[in-house]
């Protein structure tokens, strides 16, 4: 638990603490998969991730809405999110895309961006070095992520993602492709 608390504290020191910030949210059509999959983005209203070209604001559909939480970190998470949104749309639900990585002004968004850069670096090195794969990359990905200490840190770090959820309607279900949006 102490290791998990220290992990969270390091991120707060590095990226700040926005736990008291009230982020106003807006719903806009997703400019890429909005027409095809019926997806709308949940954005911070007037924030960096607010896509001005997406058109007018929409209201949340409280009867048929479903939020797909993701971190857009690694192609696997992104593909799974797309599949969930596609299935939800096919079944008559209204998918809302909640990409925590797009909220770059938030502490959580900054944490995700830093972790994504680190993961991308490791991934590139693993593609070039068999020794790195054997000694670092494979053990970390196959064994490290299963450790309770790692999962405790993930749980604690998920708290850094919670401020942006403050104005999300609590009566709309959320599915997520990563522990951070799921636990936040």
Residue ranges and their predicted role:
Residues 66-70, 174-175:
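Short hydrophobic beta-strand segments
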